């Protein structure tokens, strides 16, 4: 903790030097993307994307779970998503999973004990679980999906149940990307919706959820 305090104070200058005074009305966040990922400490969105402070609006949850939309749910995840798309008007959403996810592995091996009632409820809710992968080929063949990838695609499906997402997609003002970061190699894969497979990430890779046709 002492190291954290020493690094946090004092700062020689604001971390984001935009050339705009902090008290000016225009000094407000204008992130380029909403980055949804796991709370795992090995995943560092700004390092992964090469972005500076102010360029990413981050949403981190245990197991990078995005619950299905419920109009009556008082959910911080839903509120953050709605704020990013409605108030901040981010043009891109990046849903990023990762390999060797401790939270997912713990759930698969043994659900959290009764001593962790909130975590147990979070992981055992049916709305959070990936369904069967209809496109998955025989285990071990090229193109087959891992349980982590199936989980990630389930969250993509959940994301598309939110009205704030569907509205923006329908008006072609939002792109949704699905990535998987490999903790061991540092490589990132992207979901190619047209080919229905994960491919090495590259600029030409189409968005996982393309805008709806006019």
Regions found by a protein language model. Name each.
Residues 1-31, 40, 64-79, 85-91, ...:
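Divalent-metal-activated hydrolytic enzyme cores
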Residues 30-33, 56:
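A common structural microfeature
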Residues 41-63:
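Catalytic core of membrane glycerolipid acyltransferases/transacylases, capturing the structured
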Residues 38, 98:
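Histidine-centered active-site/metal-ligand motif
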Residues 35, 59, 95, 178, ...:
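Divalent metal-coordination and catalytic microenvironments
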Residues 91-97:
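Well-ordered alpha/beta subsegment
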């Amino acid at each position: 903790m002492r190291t954290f305090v020493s690094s946090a104070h004092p700062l020689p200058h604001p971390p984001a030097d935009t050339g705009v005074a902090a008290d000016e009305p225009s000094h407000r966040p204008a992130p380029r993307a909403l980055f949804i990922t796991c709370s795992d400490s090995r995943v560092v969105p700004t390092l992964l994307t090469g972005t500076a402070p102010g360029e990413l609006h981050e949403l981190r949850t245990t197991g990078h779970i995005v619950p299905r939309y419920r109009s009556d749910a008082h959910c911080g995840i839903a509120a953050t998503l709605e704020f990013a798309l409605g108030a901040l008007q981010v043009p891109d959403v990046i849903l990023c999973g990762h390999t060797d996810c401790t939270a997912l592995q713990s759930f698969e091996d043994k659900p959290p004990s009764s001593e962790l009632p909130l975590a147990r409820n979070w992981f055992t809710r049916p709305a959070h679980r990936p369904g069967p992968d209809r496109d998955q080929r025989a285990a071990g063949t090229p193109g087959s999906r891992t349980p982590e990838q199936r989980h990630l695609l389930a969250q993509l499906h959940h994301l598309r149940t939110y009205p704030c997402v569907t509205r923006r997609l329908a008006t072609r003002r939002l792109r949704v990307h699905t990535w998987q970061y490999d903790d061991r190699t540092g490589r990132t894969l992207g979901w190619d919706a047209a080919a229905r497979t994960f491919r090495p990430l590259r600029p030409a890779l189409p968005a996982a959820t393309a805008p709806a046709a006019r």
